[in-house]
Amino acid sequence: MVTANSTVKVGNVTFSNSAPLALIAGPCQMETRDHAFEMAGHLKEMTDKLGIGLVYKSSFDKANRTSLKAARGIGLEKALEVFSDLKKEYGFPVLTDIHTEEQCAAVAPVVDVLQIPAFLCRQTDLLIAAARTGRVVNVKKGQFLAPWDMKNVLAKITESGNPNVLATERGVSFGYNTLVSDMRALPIMAGLGAPVIFDATHSVQQPGGQGGSTGGQREFVETLARAAVAVGVAGLFIETHEDPDNAPSDGPNMVPIDKMPALLEKLMAFDRIAKAL
């Protein structure tokens, strides 16, 4: 029986619940090539300066938008070209979400981490297909799922022969259009063996809260991120944008890119204290 690795390496970035904090960050969706390079350049510069490992993230297709008319991204083929060029230019690993088994084989030659969206975390065939690529798999815990039930989700990946899996907490449904973060979930999920990531931006979502789109409360991103880092996590997942209020998706919960350096500096200080105790 294969069990989850407690330390997962993605390129030059190490994820472990006892190692220094790592970061998964980028804009919600890949809008254009130029925008991807702009965001990547800012993130690379700040993380190099702060000494934090970076996995760059962006989605080629936002397949679960609230409205049929909402922008979804630039598509798989174009995104893979951009991801490949970003890796060559900046040297960091990259992450994107996949939604079907067929996408796994197409994405894996380029992308370092295949992410399973929260709504799809119980889809057995998708989990198996992602695991069999041999790439690191990051599973978002469903908003409907208890943290201890992630045991079965992780087992679908590890028992398919892939021990390199990350488990991400991104809030739990609390009535209509609202998520809350139960910090007990972090040590519970850590007890399952895999490195745990806290998604600080999707945790402040208000799903469908704007009628035709998702709302959010970005003013609470730092609050929740501080709490998670104080508890102890392997990494943080933070979506960022230069103009969140005009972003095509998830703007209300994304962090302005110019606010990221100060935020990360604070969070790294909390991380050092938490892991020294």
UniProtKB/Swiss-Prot annotation:
Q: Which InterPro entries match?
A: Aldolase_TIM, DAHP1/KDSA, KDO8P_synthase
**Gene Ontology CC annotation, any one:** cytoplasm
Give the enzyme's EC designation: 2.5.1.55
Task: From the UniProt record, give one GO term of the biological process aspect.
Answer: keto-3-deoxy-D-manno-octulosonic acid biosynthetic process
Return one GO MF term. 3-deoxy-8-phosphooctulonate synthase activity
Pfam family membership, one: DAHP_synth_1
Q: Which residues form a coiled coil?
A: none
Reaction equations catalysed: D-arabinose 5-phosphate + phosphoenolpyruvate + H2O = 3-deoxy-alpha-D-manno-2-octulosonate-8-phosphate + phosphate
Which pathway does the UniProt entry assign to this protein?
Carbohydrate biosynthesis; 3-deoxy-D-manno-octulosonate biosynthesis; 3-deoxy-D-manno-octulosonate from D-ribulose 5-phosphate: step 2/3; Bacterial outer membrane biogenesis; lipopolysaccharide biosynthesis
Check the record and name the HAMAP family matching this protein: KDO8P_synth
Q: Which family does it belong to?
A: Belongs to the KdsA family.
Name listed for the protein in its UniProt record: 2-dehydro-3-deoxyphosphooctonate aldolase
